[in-house]
């Protein structure tokens, strides 16, 4: 999925429901919106996941900071819980992908809390996980 198309509503409105059922939106992409090297980066990540030793050095602004969920939330392509519930689902879309399985359990927890836990329960879930030592922070 190309997250830069997330907000291309004029394109999405023309799809049939069968086509909409095949669309998957990448919600929390942190990649620089103006990146022209995304294909090479994505391929490198895929090859690393396969055990290959390929390297790709991102030249995007602030790439040295790594992934930050707060940064992703400011990305023009970011899809919030509110967007999912009030924009995309009423349009007939139901497939949403959360990036970052390999970023570490603390970040994955934040994604799951944000996207899958009601705000009033987020602190309770976070405390239970921290107090139970289930989270590998390092």
Where are the regions a protein language model picked out?
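Active-site pocket-lining/capping segments in soluble small-molecule metabolic enzymes
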Residues: 1-138
């Amino acid at each position: 999925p190309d997250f830069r198309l997330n907000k291309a509503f004029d394109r999405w409105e023309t799809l049939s429901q069968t086509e909409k059922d095949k669309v998957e939106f990448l919600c929390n992409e942190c990649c620089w919106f103006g990146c022209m090297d995304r294909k090479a980066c994505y391929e490198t990540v895929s090859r690393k996941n396969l055990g290959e030793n390929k390297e790709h050095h991102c030249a995007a602004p602030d790439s040295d900071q790594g992934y930050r969920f707060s940064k992703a939330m400011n990305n023009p392509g970011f899809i919030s819980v509110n967007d999912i519930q009030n924009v995309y689902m009423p349009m007939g879309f139901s497939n949403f992908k959360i990036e970052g399985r390999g970023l570490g359990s603390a970040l994955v927890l934040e994604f799951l809390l944000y996207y899958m836990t009601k705000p009033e329960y987020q602190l309770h879930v976070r405390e239970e996980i921290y107090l139970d030592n289930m989270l590998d922070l390092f």
